[in-house]
Amino acid sequence: MSNKLTHFAIHIDDIERAKSFYDGVFDWGFNSYGQADFLQIKADKSETGELIGALQARKFSPVSEKLIGLECTIGVENLDEIVERVKNNGGQLLLPKTAIPYVGWIAKFLDTEGNLICAMQYDNSAR
């Protein structure tokens, strides 16, 4: 399929803090990739987990300003559980669980690095 998002990078200031946050919230796995301040993100912690993105230091940016980036939404099975994990792992909830009618439930939060992240529990009966 053409024009499909195939990778994302979450820009970070502290690699270990960000790794701990995303492990605690989404239970993702991580691989070193030969660069300091850069980790591949895997969809799970298995040896063969699908590579879906990266944590990377803001210094890899080609622009001098602090990168803010895209608003990415991560599909989850249980949004209430994810919201609790965000709170318990140092994130800041910006938008509590909110219905998007006929689509699902969304919450928005800042991670420990100040990035805006969305989590969505898809449910066409949401009202």
How should these model regions be labeled?
Residues E50-A57:
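A short, structured beta-strand/loop element
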Residues E65-Q92:
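Mid-chain, well-packed structural core segment of small domains
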Residues Q40, T73, I106-K108:
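Short hydrophobic/aromatic beta-strand element in the GNAT-like acyltransferase core
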Residues M1-K4, S64-G69, P101:
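Short glycine-enriched loop/turn motifs at secondary-structure junctions
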Residues S2-L5, A9-E50:
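Core segments of cupin and vicinal oxygen chelate
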Residues N3, I10, G34, V83-R127:
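Vicinal oxygen chelate
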